[in-house]
């Protein structure tokens, strides 16, 4: 993000599950659960290299044992551009999160968790492919979590613009918690399409858990409104 430029994303995520993955990664029935989140994410360029990131959310959900509704996680951090060329970028993000009343980890009970510290390395590149603009990004993160097991996360995104106003994206979210006696793992896939309308963009997609262990097989829509300024 360049000096003085910004981005805001208002996003709704609705996830539900009645199946889960056991310690051996086998899919089994679980008590039905539903989790919904409405979040606002922002980026603002403090300088050409330093970007402020924030995120706040409201959340609600229920299963057979508990209902919850209230504040979701609050995130604050800084991203520094280590390398930036016309086609590629490498950045380092350092941030902190105050966990909310909902599921702060897919394997945990609602409300479990306190404060997280995160270090994340991001690397991305863009290319032309058959007349269309494409890009790919890899993110690797380590989270030190209070009240929850520490986590390692790897996120991969691939995007293609078949026309200047349309963006197709495939994203993979992979993670593992240092939980005991079984380390929870998950791999989720999100496919979405985004339509640009000047400074605004509209995004709609679907997210689903593909594999893992000690984690729910959740799935549901993701809808977002983007605003660049």
Predicted regions and their residues:
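Short helix-loop boundary/capping segments
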Residues: 142-144, 152-157
């Amino acid at each position: 993000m360049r000096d003085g430029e910004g981005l805001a994303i208002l996003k709704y995520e609705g996830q539900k599950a009645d199946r889960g993955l056991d310690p051996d990664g086998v899919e089994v029935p679980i008590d039905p659960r539903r989790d919904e989140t409405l979040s606002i994410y922002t980026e603002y360029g403090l300088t050409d290299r330093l970007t402020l990131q924030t995120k706040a959310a409201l959340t609600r959900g229920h299963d057979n044992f508990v209902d919850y509704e209230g504040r979701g996680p609050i995130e604050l951090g800084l991203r520094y551009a280590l390398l930036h060329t016309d086609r590629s970028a490498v950045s380092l993000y350092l941030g902190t999160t105050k966990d909310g009343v909902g599921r702060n980890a897919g394997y945990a009970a609602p409300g479990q968790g306190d404060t997280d510290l995160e270090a994340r390395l991001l690397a991305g590149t863009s290319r032309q492919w058959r007349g269309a603009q494409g890009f790919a990004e890899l993110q690797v993160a380590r989270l030190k979590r209070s009240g929850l097991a520490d986590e390692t996360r790897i996120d991969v995104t691939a995007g293609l613009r078949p026309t200047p106003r349309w963006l197709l994206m495939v994203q993979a979210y992979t993670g593992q918690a240092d939980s005991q006696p079984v380390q929870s793992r998950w791999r989720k896939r999100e496919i979405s399409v985004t339509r640009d309308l000047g400074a605004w963009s509209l995004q709609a997609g679907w997210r689903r858990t593909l594999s893992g262990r000690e984690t729910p097989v959740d799935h549901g829509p993701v809808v977002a409104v983007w605003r660049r300024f």
